[in-house]
Amino acid sequence: MPAALFPSRQPGAQPPHSAAQTARPSTGRVARLGRRTAAGLAVTVTLAAALPSPAHLASHTAPAGPEVTTFTGGAFNGVSAVSAADAWAVGSISPPQGRNFRTLVAHWDGTRWARVPSPSPGEPDVATLAGVSAVSAADAWAVGFYGTAGLRTLVLHWDGTRWARVPSPNPGAPVSSTALAGVSAVSASSAWAVGAYGNTEKTLVLRWNGTRWAQVPSPSPGGAQGTQLLGVTSLPQGGAWAVGCSGSSSQRTLALQWTGTRWTQAPTPSPGFSACLNAVTAVSASDVWAVGWAARRHNGPAQTLLLHWDGTRWTRVASPSPRLASTELTGVSATSAADAWAVGGVVRHQVSKTFVLHWDGTCWARVASPSQGSSVLNGVSGVSSSDALAAGSGGTGSLALRWTGSRWVIS
């Protein structure tokens, strides 16, 4: 998930996602887009290359019962819940015929997931949705990218009746690519979307003012080399945070704060040889969580990384990370100061399984979570202490989990 819009993984390290072989382009510097683009397949996208050819599409209800739905050939990259009976999950899926991935949007009504039609640029373009944010039953945003030789931003909006494409800036066009990885909306007139653009990768921040999307200047530290934003969260009071990483051979964590007038970089711990932040969530201006991974050495296994903002500074908080395994956190969601979830994947012996942590106000602890074949979770959205949804991929298709208040079950 998260593979990442511009895959956020330490070069050469064993990635903590699916055991399926990762496709790596043979030319060009790899840009990091860590969201998974096909079931069980983590694809590293070069800004100058298209995704690999997909398998055929099928959707079915799994044998476990009518409440368990998977979309074969697809993967969820993000999830956002308005209530226990109203949530969206987005990603990409391979069509029954055709060479490239199309957008995947599914709706949760409290009982089952159902696919909803979503715009997707035609062949030969690939199209994937990397993030989603729902404000109400009639207001939700999904963002990602499309293209072949050059990527372009893709923004969709839900008005309560249908998903429609909305124009969005592409500062890299026509000479370089532009893509979006995350979105956060707080009202019909306020939303942020983040990603990266340019052949050397610069941070990209777009703002919705109720009428149109416009680019807002944002810092690109490290000479813009390998710089990318992968997650964003906004506060009702007007503040916002965006996270990601910068650097190529050795990545450093990156956090940008919206002060109300401009984006500024805040110092963040960046342990080990390489580290990156994939997602961020805020309870208040003085209670913010960011998650990702850190590797102690070049080509070494990844470990979980959890940072907390207390209103003054970012500090690293201890988090479980299995020994003799590679583990990454790709999504995070907090409903209160004593209730937060972080999700991702753990790879051991070339097999990937879902990985879930919970914050109870005192410490992060691992919580058992089901997998479906080789699995990974790319996003999570909490509604209350007794209700949450997580989404990703497992086996040959999409995977969605639901927290019942006592355990995680496949939904």
Please name every model-derived segment:
Residues 16, 31-43, 133, 183-184, ...:
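Generic alpha-helix initiation/capping and coil-helix boundary signal
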Residues 2-5, 26-58:
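Secretory targeting and sorting signals
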Residues 1-25:
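N-terminal low-complexity Pro/Gly-rich stretches
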Residues 9, 24, 29-36, 162, ...:
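Basic polycationic patches enriched in arginine
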Residues 55-411:
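Residue-level hotspots at or immediately adjacent to binding/recognition sites across diverse folds
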